[in-house]
Design a protein with these regions (language model features):
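Surface-exposed intrinsically disordered loops and tails
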Residues: 2-10, 74-95, 102, 119-134, ...
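C-terminal subdomain of the subtilisin-like protease fold in secreted/lumenal serine endopeptidases
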Residues: 63-66, 141, 211-314
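Extracellular S/T/G-rich loop segment that most often corresponds to the catalytic His/Ser-adjacent loop
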Residues: 1, 128-211, 215
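Sec-exported extracytoplasmic/periplasmic mature domains
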Residues: 24-28, 58-59, 70, 101-105, ...
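Hydrolase catalytic cores
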Residues: 20-23, 42-44, 176-250
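Subtilisin-like serine protease catalytic core
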Residues: 1-49, 59-60, 73-76, 104, ...
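Substrate-binding/access-modulating region of protease and related hydrolase catalytic domains
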Residues: 14, 25-26, 42-136, 185-200
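Structural recognition of the beta-strand scaffold that forms the well-ordered cores
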Residues: 1, 20-22, 31-33, 38-43, ...
């Protein structure tokens, strides 16, 4: 019911079915990250088909475009990010690269990292902003990791995909271990492990944030995911300035850390309110102080008044 568009001639496939269900599935057996999200389904069939799918996403105004695939060489090894590999895949004037640039100007492209833990570089697509820097504001890469956590947060993770490497500045981790839908029937499910199933969690998270914060554009939502990621289980050695002086630490192994959707939905930094005179004050600072003689009159009179509260990301 939540499929808005299907690219013509798309084959039935267990992998794609599982990925879609992680992003937006809803049944008695499992619930995806954003069960109310609408999906436009495309497929990997060469760069022309990929360009068509990307252009469709742009036409539909999709918040996120999930990509649970990557290029490999003739031996099946990850095609690392490099100008040479970019030229091999895209050549000059390739419609797919143009479609990605156009879509990422407004939406967010999400790519799964390689599942090879031994990779020493990021794949071409996960780290494509290294080649085309204009993509970075609309790009995320997602690795797969199993977290060890308690009520205070994540203590450590077991990385079971490639590290973030060159994609670190726009990389997140999620747990790509899911019981998800398969293509066998409309009641069939199977166990899945891989970065392919971590990426749609981030894409679904962007959809949920779009519902929660309708005034924010997809690039703003992307920044919320990066700024709220749990990076307490490692020592950052690089810092990304998110906005308004707010920085978030990352490193080449874990990127910005583990996806934390709850934190992304809560205020980030200092909640604040703009007063009538234009001054900005912290939300926990007293705005009105009344004497006991007023009783609850001021509280009651202001109970129906709406105020706009922003956080450090506005």
């Amino acid at each position: 019911d939540n499929v808005a568009n299907v690219q013509g001639g798309m084959p039935v496939d267990d992998h794609g079915t599982a990925v879609a269900s992680v992003a937006a599935g809803f049944s008695d057996t499992m619930v995806g990250i954003a069960p109310n999200a609408k999906l436009a389904l495309g497929y990997y069939g060469g760069t022309t088909a990929l360009a068509n799918a990307t252009n469709t996403a742009r036409t539909l105004g999709a918040v996120a475009q999930n990509n649970s695939w990557g290029f490999v060489d003739l031996s099946g090894n990850t095609l690392y990010v490099s100008p040479t590999n970019y030229a091999t895949i895209f050549g000059s004037g390739n419609s797919y690269s143009s479609a990605l640039v156009n879509y990422a100007a407004d939406g967010v492209v999400v790519f799964a990292m390689s599942n090879e833990t031994s990779d020493t570089n990021a794949g071409l697509m996960e780290a494509l902003p290294v080649i085309l820097p204009q993509l970075e504001a609309g790009w995320l890469a997602v690795g797969n990791a199993i977290p060890d956590f308690d009520a205070n947060g994540i203590n450590s993770v077991q990385l079971i995909s490639s590290a973030c490497h060159e994609a670190a500045a726009w990389c997140l981790l999620a747990d790509g271990t899911w019981n998800a839908a398969t293509a066998a029937s409309d009641t069939a499910y199977g166990f899945n492990v891989g970065s392919s199933f971590a990426a749609p969690q981030v894409s679904g998270a962007l959809a949920l944030l779009a519902e929660a914060f309708p005034a924010l554009d997809p690039h703003d939502l992307r920044l919320r995911l990066l700024a709220s990621a749990d990076n307490g289980f490692f020592t950052p050695d690089q810092w990304l300035e998110i906005e308004n002086g707010l920085k978030h630490g990352y490193n080449d192994t874990y990127g910005h850390g583990f996806l934390d959707l709850r934190a992304a939905l809560l205020p980030i930094g200092t909640p604040q309110v703009t007063l009538a005179d234009g001054n900005v004050t912290a939300l926990n600072a007293p705005l009105i102080v009344s004497g006991s003689a007023f009783g609850d009159a001021i509280t009651r009179s202001l109970s129906a008044v709406d105020i706009t509260v922003t956080d450090s990301l506005n």
